[in-house]
C-alpha cells in the first residue's frame, strides 16, 4: 500500500515538472539529454526523491535511469546552493512542492475548514 501511494505521488511530481519545465516524462526519468530545462527538471525530481521520500543517493538510479549516485549528490548540492542564492529558484521549488503535493494540501485544507466550521 505504501509503495502504491509513493508511486502516485511521484507520478504527480513528474507531471508538475513536465508542466513547469515543458519537458516530457522520459526527459525526467532518463539521463539522455543535457539541455537546461531537462537538467533542471531532473535536478528538482532528484531533490524531491531525496528530501521528501528519503531515497538514498545510491538508489536514485532506480527512479532516474542512468543517474550515478555522485551525480545525484552533485545535483542536490547544486540545487540547495541555487535556492540560497536565487529567490527565483527557491520560488520555483515552492511552486513545484505545491503542485506535487496538491492532493495532500487540498485534503489538509478541507480538514482545517471542517474543523473551523464545526469546532467553536
Where are the model-predicted features located?
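Short, Lys/Arg-enriched anionic-surface-contact patches
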Residues: 18-42, 67
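Short Lys/Arg-enriched helix C-cap and helix-to-coil transition segments
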Residues: 83-110
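Short, basic interhelical loop/turn and adjoining N-cap
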Residues: 56-58, 62-75
Amino acid at each position: 500500500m505504501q509503495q502504491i501511494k509513493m508511486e502516485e505521488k511521484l507520478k504527480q511530481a513528474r507531471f508538475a515538472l513536465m508542466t513547469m519545465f515543458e519537458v516530457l516524462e522520459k526527459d525526467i526519468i532518463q539521463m539522455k539529454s543535457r539541455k537546461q530545462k531537462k537538467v533542471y527538471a531532473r535536478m528538482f525530481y532528484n531533490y524531491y526523491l531525496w528530501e521528501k521520500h528519503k531515497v538514498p543517493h545510491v538508489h536514485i538510479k532506480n527512479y532516474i535511469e542512468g543517474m550515478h549516485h555522485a551525480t545525484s549528490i552533485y545535483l542536490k548540492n547544486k540545487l540547495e546552493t541555487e535556492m540560497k542564492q536565487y529567490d527565483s529558484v527557491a520560488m520555483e521549488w515552492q511552486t513545484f512542492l505545491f503542485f506535487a503535493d496538491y492532493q495532500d494540501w487540498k485534503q489538509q485544507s478541507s480538514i482545517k475548514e471542517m474543523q473551523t466550521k464545526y469546532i467553536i
